[in-house]
Amino acid sequence: MGKEKTHINIVVIGHVDSGKSTTTGHLIYKLGGIDKRVIERFEKEAAEMNKRSFKYAWVLDKLKAERERGITIDIALWKFETTKYYCTVIDAPGHRDFIKNMITGTSQADCAVLIIDSTTGGFEAGISKDGQTREHALLAFTLGVKQMICCCNKMDATTPKYSKARYEEIVKEVSSYLKKVGYNPDKVPFVPISGFEGDNMIERSTNLDWYKGPTLLEALDQINEPKRPSDKPLRLPLQDVYKIGGIGTVPVGRVETGVIKPGMVVTFGPTGLTTEVKSVEMHHESLLEALPGDNVGFNVKNVAVKDLKRGFVASNSKDDPAKEAANFTSQVIIMNHPGQIGNGYAPVLDCHTSHIAVKFAELVTKIDRRSGKELEALPKFLKNGDAGIVKMIPTKPMVVETFATYPPLGRFAVRDMRQTVAVGVIKGVEKKDPTGAKVTKAAIKKK
């Protein structure tokens, strides 16, 4: 056994019919951990249902259906391996909550793979004002996904097939858009592929012999290795809290920064509840320490399940413990709000795993979203396309941090009317000190 490969997380984005599922399914199918028996079962069902286009999207549809029905799928199904990396696809696109998950979830995407439908009409629909291609790319950039790979998909269905001219037209247009968003298009590989036929996915395609760049697999291998923030203080937003017979209370979540280990005394924000960590587990194995990116369950002593909730944040009681935010100042970009947003607006904020209404207490300035320069002080309102600095007050206790210190806890989506109306990053937080927070016996002993 050589050195274990680095794990990286990938978010697949693009317009609704661009072929995200087929492309992702194809990678997982060819390079992934899907059990051959499962594939055979899917193939048989596909044949019975006469789904010629089965191949790969079907695999993903099955996985998604099982996931949505709450059947926990072995998450290995969403993994695949390149020469250099273990890759996890952190969201299956086309999912209702995709945008929300992107915001709460992309915190840990190391690279976005943007899938473009290269067919006549398909590309134009995706990149149009209403298309999702733009929104997804903007979101990915705002939320700190610095690396991108662009796949010009469905090259087998361009006119003429595998058209170099069409590819070049798309590269030109998408590059200019990505540049506006903030990416450097010279650093973004544009790979012409067919997710269905498999051209340039893994092996080079003779159909595209005019293209000299990397295949999708090679482009994934060229991703810069991410630096994991294990030297920062612990921040672990809770996704769920379970009561497990014979063990007790087990909060579950992903370590975003720092490390968590047995024997550590943790403080949960926003309440300040403090207790000792008895054990830490990942995939049913005990760990001596968990690092950023690890999804773990950990057992805490003398704590009732009702004292912890999704959205609470575990932190090291001795190293910058998490606290409730009294208010915070954010830079927001209004993405799709039908009217105008003024002081007093109270939408829901999705930040890490919390989902809480906040009040836009004061619009401080309106700024140019490209340069960050101030355009207007104390504007009356912000509308679509505007960016501004806003002071916000949570309506319930919540933990947020500045984007500069703890990026995953410093970015958010503003949701209203069942859609993402804005995204933002947090510039400053005024914190409250907890009063009368419970400190368990186990924690006192450790002091």
Curated annotation (Swiss-Prot):
Positions of the region G1?
Answer: 14-21
Q: Which residues carry this modification: 5-glutamyl glycerylphosphorylethanolamine?
A: E289, E362
Note the Pfam families from the entry: GTP-eEF1A_C, GTP_EFTU, GTP_EFTU_D2
List every stretch annotated G4. 153-156
Give all N6,N6,N6-trimethyllysine modified positions: K79, K187, K306, K396
Query: Which residues are recorded as modified (N6,N6-dimethyllysine)?
Result: K55
Annotated positions of the N6-methyllysine modification? K261
Residues annotated as region G2? 70-74
User: What is the purpose of this protein?
Assistant: This protein promotes the GTP-dependent binding of aminoacyl-tRNA to the A-site of ribosomes during protein biosynthesis.
This chain belongs to the protein called Elongation factor 1-alpha
